[in-house]
Amino acid sequence: MEDKFVILDFETTGCDIFNTPPKELGYFKSKTWYDPIELALIDLSSGMEYHYFIEPHPDFVVKGKSWATEVHGYEPDKFIKRDDLQKWTDVFPEVQRVLTGKTAVAHNAFGFDKIVMEQTCEKYNLMPPLCKWRDTKAEIKKMYPDRKHSQVDVAKWMFDETYEAHSAIEDVRMLSKIFQSINEKPDWIFI
């Protein structure tokens, strides 16, 4: 049976509520990530796009604690006043339906997106979707070791394109192109 793929991207507050000191393994490994504020998915088997702005968990709406605004552009005071925010518990049943039995594809899946999914589900006492995961960042590092591997850089050298990075919906649209390009290449080329 052929795998069905779902392109996925989270944006999170990036707020370090536990004042975790940076670890040698890097920024992403020293954080707690049950703080999604935006999620986008594209189900490649149907072409359907899903895009949610998510009400952050109250733990991450703390006076004096900044978000990763320089990355995604969302300012806490403005974001929490949006009228299109949904609760994770309301969004999750559809996310689970879309992902279950398929392969989630994300750029930095094993260093970020999969962890966000697992920690958020754990925080809300939900079972994560039963799906496989693929990490395009790891795959591109292996396939093109001499190239830059951030998604923005890959879009530039692979397609000579720029896009609105760190908007979850724009990230999944670009990652869909990147993934389909690298997924078409036979494995024997990289032996």
Residue ranges and their predicted role:
Residues 133-149:
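Short alpha-helix plus adjacent loop in nuclease-associated cores
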Residues 3, 157, 169, 173-191:
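Acidic two-metal-ion nuclease catalytic site recognized across multiple nuclease folds
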Residues 2-118, 130, 152-159, 166:
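Conserved non-catalytic scaffold segment of RNase H-like nuclease domains
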Residues 123-129:
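Short helix-capping segments at alpha-helix termini
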Residues 144-174:
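Metal-dependent de-N-acetylase/amidase catalytic core
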